[in-house]
Swiss-Prot record:
Organism expressing this protein natively: Sus scrofa
Protein name per the record: Fibroblast growth factor 7
Glycosylation sites noted in the Swiss-Prot or TrEMBL record: 45
Gene Ontology MF terms: growth factor activity; heparin binding; type 2 fibroblast growth factor receptor binding
Subcellular location: Secreted
GO biological process terms, semicolon-separated: fibroblast growth factor receptor signaling pathway; lung development; neurogenesis; positive regulation of cell division; positive regulation of epithelial cell proliferation; positive regulation of MAPK cascade; regulation of cell migration
Species classification: Eukaryota, Metazoa, Chordata, Craniata, Vertebrata
Record InterPro entries: Fibroblast_GF_fam (IPR002209), IL1/FGF (IPR008996)
Family: Belongs to the heparin-binding growth factors family.
Keywords of the record: Glycoprotein, Growth factor, Heparin-binding, Mitogen, Secreted, Signal
Amino acid sequence: MRKWILTWILPSLLHRSCFHIICLVGTLSLDCNDMTPEQMATNVNCSSPERHTRSYDYMEGGDIRVRRLFCRTQWYPRIGKRGKVKGTQEMKNNYNIMEIRTVAVGIVAIKGVVSEYYLAMNKEGKLYAKKEYNEDCNFKELILENHYNTYASAKWTHSGGEMFVALNQKGVPVRGKKTKKEQKTAHFLPMAIT
């Protein structure tokens, strides 16, 4: 008789405990919905203004990141005070600090913070700097599997292929016509300013 009572009571006990767990989880989710985004960000251990650099959220538009772009060829692109684009190996050079502003999904504009010139590419694939923003300043940002980023002109192509921002082993900008996504000259790591 005891065996029959246990098999009869056990399912009802399980259903009650499941019901209590569901009620508890529902209460917790309702509590989270009452939080502001800043409170939720605090609870998940990240701050609202600072997003993870490998997150794709910034590609949705309007986000501004201040970074140094480090090329796999060991150079940082810099935009000088007169607008000359070249590479430098000095990490603490203020002319290599870039403002990367999202202008559309996957499209960014790169601006030298100190020089206030935008990085641009013309139809021949030459990198240059421009004081006023225009379509030449738009680049498609792509995060590769090796954790580096590439920046291809959003406006110009060469024979149907993309033209990338690239620095050779001497820090000289490579013409976009001679670049490919796979080349390490076109791979950049956005580094936070410390």
